[in-house]
């Protein structure tokens, strides 16, 4: 506070506000914040004038934070009232002023009387309705600002302070201690001053960031001239394909954009190598899309997969269904199929080859036997015929043309024989008696087979007419003689 003692707070320039000017990182990630307000509670650490102090807790595991400087000093430098970092870029004042070539070190007085007069003039212009804007918002950011600016909040700096009793080994609170039980880091960053941060002089954090910016270089183009793809990493749900296209289209014509959401990356392919080199040079270390900093590097060509052994390809057999292990091993051990003469195409496969074969379809499985000798003989004949050539067509259907010899199965399993023999002229009468057909609804029954109709024995049939004729002849002779 000034050396003069005034009873009028408004005339003295004491600050009274309703809400602080703070950055998003200091406010915290919790949208519901309980904040306390104390008018004229502390004096500003820059101008030493009393101001309204706000105090809140930005998170569950964070420490309580409060405003350190008044809003007048905050507006002069466009910084946060708590961390004294730039409100727009999140950088220290020294880094921002160096990158934008701004010299404000001599514009703010340092003596008590001059500081008070300077602050009163600034407050008077604000009350008069003048739109007082600093030159920070009118200057466009350059490459250094884009490389170093913070695009997302950094809540880690809201953690609790280190417990001093733990450092000496005397803390008895254990897990209930509200401070961190860690050893402090020693170095230049541990020696920070709030006034040096505000004026931008000898700030160790700013010197570290400026040194990091000088070490950043451009991307080196690969020697392979066929590479025209750029890798973009660090994507999130807010970055869409159209946003990436708008950012890269200004440097050349784009051939394709491939986004891998599960890996949070994208690949941008240009039609020419010159467009890819121009984009890599202009956007290296300064690619920001929708407020998200992205990583940009050259894409690597995909390594071709090693070819499989040719012997394994020839020995592999595709199965349309589940086959027994013995059958699979037998098929895999068979030699490759023979080529046809004169390079003819292979013959067509039979229609039942694509049908899946299951172990339960084998009639000889689980000890099944034939019902009769005749059916067994006919089944064995049909089995031999099917194994030698192919299945006989149904009755009345014959192939029209056979341009090729009987097909060879080419290392595949022969088709399974039919459980029942097909119908043809040479079928036995026993099959008709063993497998009668039931008439369906609305169909007329078939007439019985001539061989199946029951008839009397031949002797009885021929004896009946002969006996009756003999009796009639004897009767005729007796009648004649009597007459």
Swiss-Prot record:
Residues 336-351, 438-459 have a biased composition (Pro residues). A zinc finger (C3H1-type) spans 157-184. Residues 381-391 have a biased composition (Polar residues). InterPro entries: Cwc2/Slt11, Nucleotide-bd_a/b_plait_sf, RBD_domain_sf, RRM_dom, STL11/RBM22-like_N, Torus, Znf_CCCH, Znf_CCCH_sf. Residues 298-317, 336-483 are annotated as: Disordered. Gene3D superfamilies: 3.30.70.330, Zinc finger, CCCH-type. Residues 370-380, 392-401, 409-423, 460-476 have a biased composition (Low complexity). Residues 228-301 form the RRM domain. The keyword Zinc applies. This is Zinc finger CCCH domain-containing protein 25. It comes from Arabidopsis thaliana.
């Amino acid at each position: 506070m000034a050396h003069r003692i005034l009873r009028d707070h408004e005339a003295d320039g004491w600050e009274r506000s309703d809400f602080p000017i703070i950055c998003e990182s200091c406010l915290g990630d919790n949208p519901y914040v309980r904040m306390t307000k104390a008018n004229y509670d502390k004096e500003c650490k820059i101008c030493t004038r009393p101001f309204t102090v706000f105090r809140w807790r930005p998170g569950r595991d964070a420490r309580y934070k409060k405003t350190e400087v008044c809003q007048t000093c905050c507006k002069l430098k466009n910084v946060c009232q708590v961390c004294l970092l730039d409100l727009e870029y999140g950088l220290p004042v020294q880094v921002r002023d160096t990158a934008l070539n701004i010299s404000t070190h001599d514009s703010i007085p340092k003596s008590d009387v001059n500081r008070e007069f300077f602050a009163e003039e600034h407050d008077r212009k604000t009350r008069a309705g003048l739109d007082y804007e600093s030159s920070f918002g009118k200057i466009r950011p350059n490459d250094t600002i884009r490389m170093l600016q913070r695009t997302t909040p950094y809540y880690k700096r809201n953690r609790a302070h280190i417990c001093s009793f733990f450092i000496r080994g005397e803390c008895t609170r254990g897990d209930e201690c509200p401070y961190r039980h860690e050893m402090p880091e020693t170095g230049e960053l541990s020696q920070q001053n709030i006034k040096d941060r505000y004026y931008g002089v000898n700030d160790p954090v700013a010197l570290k960031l400026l040194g990091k910016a000088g070490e950043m270089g451009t991307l080196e183009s690969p020697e392979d001239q066929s590479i025209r793809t750029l890798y973009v990493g660090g994507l999130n749900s807010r970055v869409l394909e159209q946003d990436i296209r708008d950012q890269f289209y200004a440097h050349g014509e784009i051939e394709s954009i491939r986004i891998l959401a599960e890996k949070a990356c994208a690949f941008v392919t240009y039609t020419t190598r010159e467009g890819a080199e121009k984009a890599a040079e202009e956007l290296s270390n300064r690619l920001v899309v929708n407020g998200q900093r992205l990583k940009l590097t050259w894409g690597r060509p995909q390594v071709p997969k090693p070819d499989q052994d040719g012997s394994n390809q020839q020995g592999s057999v595709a199965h349309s269904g589940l086959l027994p292990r013995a059958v699979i091993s037998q098929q895999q051990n068979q030699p490759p199929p023979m080529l046809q003469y004169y390079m003819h195409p292979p013959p067509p496969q039979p229609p039942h080859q694509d049908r899946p074969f299951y172990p339960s379809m084998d009639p000889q499985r689980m000890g099944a036997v034939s019902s009769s000798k005749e059916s067994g003989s006919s089944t064995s004949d049909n089995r031999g015929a099917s194994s030698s050539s192919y299945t006989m067509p149904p009755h009345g259907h014959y192939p029209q043309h056979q341009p090729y010899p009987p097909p060879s199965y080419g290392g595949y399993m022969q088709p399974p024989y039919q459980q029942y023999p097909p119908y043809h002229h040479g079928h036995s009468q026993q099959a008709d008696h063993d497998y009668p057909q039931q008439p369906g609804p609305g169909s007329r029954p078939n007439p019985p087979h001539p061989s199946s109709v029951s008839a009397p024995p031949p002797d009885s049939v021929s004896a009946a007419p002969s006996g009756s004729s003999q009796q009639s002849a004897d009767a005729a002779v007796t009648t004649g003689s009597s007459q």
